[in-house]
Amino acid sequence: MTAVDTNVVVRLLTGDDAKQAAAARALFAAGPIWIAKTVLLESGWVLRSLYGFDTGAIRDALTRLLGLKNVRVEDAAAVAAALTLTQSGIDLADAMHLSSRPVGARFVSFDKAFVARAKRAGASGVARV
């Protein structure tokens, strides 16, 4: 199994550097790949900040990536829940934080808009401080 860094994921998803994209494709084809949640978070940030991806495009790209047969991801259930939450307008980082909390734990934030979006998405135990 090979764990990958954000730049490998971004090269695979964007293909913006032909040589590195080819190397990333070969790596992903060669065997099992492990992706940490932090790599997914940083990939989302890079795709938004440097490549102009919106939340839907980030969700679609990461969903395709995680659908590859040889890709394993840290805390797959939380990542899947986070990607689903982004459909409700919650950004990837907030969705990942919310979906990664222990079962039954409250989640609090000063961000009024986030709390409202989370509640509209059906998340329970979310409150504003």
State the predicted function of each range:
Residues 30-32, 70, 102-106:
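Short active-site oxyanion
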Residues 1-35, 50-60, 121-129:
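Short, well-structured N-terminal submotif of metal-dependent ribonuclease cores
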Residues 8, 39, 78, 96-97, ...:
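Alpha-helix capping/helix-boundary segments
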Residues 4, 35, 73, 92-95, ...:
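Short beta-strand scaffold positions
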Residues 37-40, 59-87:
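Acidic catalytic patch
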Residues 1, 85, 98-129:
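Acidic, PIN/NYN-like endoribonuclease modules and their adjacent C-terminal/linker elements
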